[in-house]
């Protein structure tokens, strides 16, 4: 489109300018550009006149293809906005085309075009004919004027129908245009176009059924759509009948029946009557009198059933037509000789079945059936009297001599009714033929021969030639046994005695059989006569003998019938089995082949899909990149154009082209803009300064001149206001005086009624006083009764409330006393336990000192012996001292930097037994517990001295960790002990929950499991003496951590570990009290918080942490859980038991002022068995922070702890029975259990969860426990816990640095590989002892925390009310951890 036609209004104006000068083609081009433009795809009001003008030009120029394009574009524009505009435009277009065609028709004398097909106007024959015959002026005028316009109008109809098809919004317009097209075909007798139009409509209907999922699709189940389609098809049927296109009419009938079948509801009776009427015409025109009569039967029954206002005349007319149509059905069967020879029975039957379907019949009708229906439904009684006897004469009575005379009277009456009954005239020829046939059938039964003249006299309504033809047809098709003798002019009947009639021969009135039929049935008659004679001839005893013989035969049959039957069944079963076997084999083979083919096809398909997917991804990626580049360039260009359009941009970039600007730096563009802006700003300020001086003088002068004028105007306005006020005041006074006079008049007039009013009021009060007093009395009585009832109800309620309050206070008092008593008992018990622990701790430390001294001396002696043995061995092997090696094996190991065993042989006193006794405990000699002091210098660097005792000579590959030389895990086939099992005879105190590392020097009083002189380094990862969490069939490879490179743990049903370890935890269990390993994954461990509901551990961060955070509720777990421990797991939403804590232990951050006694698994406490860790480290901070993530917890009553201890004692008894075989290990276990019982704190019951009833017992199981009270108490405890956690939670991670490492931490077993070499010298020093904690201070702090907890319990409701005013704030640190601040 040209640049100066950006708006549609301008285009329309330009087109009108072209039309004024007579240029239609340029005007059409202008409007065409507007309709094709993509910038005007939104409908506007101006579009409709543009489209009308565009179509007008298309009609004038006969540009049907341009009109089609324009209509399609306009449909896309206004379909979603204004569909009415599209209808108006289409109707206007067709109206203009019709007007042009009518004008051309008036100018032409040719009313009906001789051209057969408008799409192919000039055929070769027409060209040759015009060249030979010549063409006059009128013919040329008709060809040049009328023919193009008729073709244009036809194309317009066809284009509009294609445009509007399958669109529910313009469905009415579509059917209107279709009906107009039918009228066009009928008006101009366009048979070829009519056929094309019918095919197009049929194709559109099929498309509607296929594309029913579109948004604008037509729903054929809609009654309105069905009625419109049926209406159009009926118009099509009428037009086809009018144009005598019976093939198209029959197709229209099929289309109408198809629409009937689509409809769920039956069509209207009027529509069905019209349909039957049209179908009957089609059948009669096609020569099918049988279905024509059947259609009239259907129409007759429909009219009788549905029409309530059916008159007697209409009934007679319909019944007469039905009778004549039924009797007009040819008696001659439709099957001809050619059909019999070609065996076309199937085709005929199929054709009749289709025709019956169009009428809704189950089976094709027959002439006899229709006659019987006519008699059964009593149609004859409504027939006019003149025709009523025709049925009896033709079908019932046998009177050949008077038959034609009677029928002639009826036919003459029918011929006399052309005006009243025009449709009856068509039945006369068929009735004459049937009458002749009936006459011949009846005459053949009476006469053997008859003269032709005599027969002609019996049939007066036909001549001799027609009669002879009828006789010949009857002999050919109706099995009439007749011969014509032309010499004697006679007819002979039944002369051929060998003739046999066909089965489909017509049947009529019967008098006697023909001679040939009598001869053919002679044997049958003879048989019946002989049977009667035998009954007379044969006596009774012969019949009795026959009966006896019959019984004997029956008996013999019954005797052998079962056996014979079984034999037949067995043979049949054998045959069936063989068939089934062969079929199964064939099916199996075909199935295998099919599966093989499907597998190959699947592979090919997958490969092809993968290739296509990759190609699609690459193409999509390239397309996205190109689009991004184009969008980027377009955005930059538009931005630069916008900048240049502004005054500032035009000045700044007037000397620079847009192409150059695209390559410039954005900073340069911005600098240019800023520079130009500053420049204009300075110029503006200078202009404002110059104007300021001028404006000041001018304003001063104006105001001096205004002063006198303003004063004079003020005086004038004041005078006008005063006059106006005086005038309004006078009017107000006058009005008030008039109103007072009128009020006095009203008063005088109304005062005369005062006495009457008082009298009326007095009478009314006297009449209603008694009624008022009665109602007042009733009200007072009801009031007193209601007041008494309410007082009684209130008294009862107060009494009930006092009773409920008394029992509730009594119950609370009992509960409080019970809790106080339990608290006192717990304090006393804990105080006694602490005193006992202090005493045992002192004894333990003294014993440790002695053991350390013994171990040091023994280790020194062993070193001297080992040194001498090593030198002697070297001298014997080498024979000279030139091969100078390191002075001691310590140097070798230091240079190697690993714990692995070298290839040299071990000393005999160091070599363990050949069997794997070290797995069962026998391999640990008594002095291992005394070697710990000497082992310390070699802990990291020289581990090969204990290798023979640790593992046998097996073929396992070494571990891949930095210091773990154990072989990979093996299955149950090797002789190692399985990780899990009831027959595991390892020390039973190492259970699934115990993830502590091996005991070090200070706590090694456990017998032969870890002796003081055990020179093995600390076990890494999941070493051989861990608890039973590994099953016997587990064959996983080694761990992959810092010192343990085995794979992650495998969850599942066979993993019997305690529930504090989830299935996705890939770390090995902690190995004991002094486990000081760091996080599992090193410095980059950025995993989120643990998954336990009440996890109070810190995150797994930092390589210098004294131990990695625990997983779940295992930070204070019991130290000697066995594999068969039946306690419920303390992890997951179903776990109702919290960790073992005190009643007031809120499990927040473990700060330096924590007065609780050190627990097992807690590395933060000082002691000889724990590294000294600075309190308030990252674990305490993380525990305080993560405490806000889990649900609140309450302490567990002492009864729960006693229950758990009883279960533990039961497990101890089981373990003792298992360990009777190993008394050394039993002593070791008893010492360890004794120590752990001393230092283990009692666990608390989480108040927010409860365990199963069969495994938990507490004071709540009393008679007062019910669901509601328990829920209330649980909610109260949850609220108190939540308030306490939010109040005590302090995120002090930002204020504190990383945890300081003490001397005990420097030798922790989880140290990185690059730190071990530097720390080996430090590890050789003996461990330093740390004094026990101050127990008195612990007791004081414990009591303070309990008192504080009691205060918090009392004030939890006030805190809860204030809690709604607080807001939460989530803070995220640099490590990704989120802290909830309240």
From Swiss-Prot:
UniProt feature, compositional bias: Basic and acidic residues: 866-1165, 1177-1328, 1336-1371
Residues recorded as bearing N6-acetyllysine in the entry: 68
Keywords for the protein's UniProt record, in alphabetical order: Acetylation, Coiled coil, Cytoplasm, Host-virus interaction, Initiation factor, Phosphoprotein, Protein biosynthesis, Repeat, RNA-binding
A GO term from the CC aspect: cytosol
PTM notes: Phosphorylated. Phosphorylation is enhanced upon serum stimulation.
Chain segments annotated as coiled-coil in the UniProt record: 82-120
Molecular function terms from GO: mRNA binding; receptor tyrosine kinase binding; RNA binding; structural molecule activity; translation initiation factor activity
BP term (GO), one: IRES-dependent viral translational initiation
Top-level taxonomic group: Eukaryota
Domain PCI: 315-498
InterPro entries reported in the protein's UniProt record: EIF3A (IPR027512), eIF3a_PCI_TPR-like (IPR054711), PCI_dom (IPR000717)
Protein's cellular compartments: Cytoplasm
Signal peptide: none
Segments of this protein annotated with the region Interaction with EIF3B: 664-835
Sequence repeats: 925-934, 935-942, 943-952, 953-962, 963-972, 973-982, 983-992, 993-1002, 1003-1012, 1013-1022, 1023-1032, 1033-1042, 1043-1052, 1054-1063, 1064-1073, 1074-1083, 1084-1093, 1094-1103, 1104-1113, 1114-1123, 1124-1133, 1134-1143, 1144-1152, 1153-1162, 1163-1172
A Pfam cross-reference name: PCI
Start and end residues of each stretch annotated as 25 X 10 AA approximate tandem repeats of [DE]-[DE]-[DE]-R-[SEVGFPILV]-[HPSN]-[RSW]-[RL]-[DRGTIHN]-[EPMANLGDT]: 925-1172
Spans annotated as Disordered: 810-844, 866-1382
Keyword RNA-binding: yes
Family classification: Belongs to the eIF-3 subunit A family.
Its biological purpose: RNA-binding component of the eukaryotic translation initiation factor 3 (eIF-3) complex, which is required for several steps in the initiation of protein synthesis. The eIF-3 complex associates with the 40S ribosome and facilitates the recruitment of eIF-1, eIF-1A, eIF-2:GTP:methionyl-tRNAi and eIF-5 to form the 43S pre-initiation complex (43S PIC). The eIF-3 complex stimulates mRNA recruitment to the 43S PIC and scanning of the mRNA for AUG recognition.
Quaternary state and interactors: Interacts with EIF4G1. Component of the eukaryotic translation initiation factor 3 (eIF-3) complex, which is composed of 13 subunits: EIF3A, EIF3B, EIF3C, EIF3D, EIF3E, EIF3F, EIF3G, EIF3H, EIF3I, EIF3J, EIF3K, EIF3L and EIF3M. The eIF-3 complex appears to include 3 stable modules: module A is composed of EIF3A, EIF3B, EIF3G and EIF3I; module B is composed of EIF3F, EIF3H, and EIF3M; and module C is composed of EIF3C, EIF3D, EIF3E, EIF3L and EIF3K. EIF3C of module C binds EIF3B of module A and EIF3H of module B, thereby linking the three modules.
Official protein name in the record: Eukaryotic translation initiation factor 3 subunit A
Organism from which the protein derives: Homo sapiens (Human)
GN (gene name): EIF3A
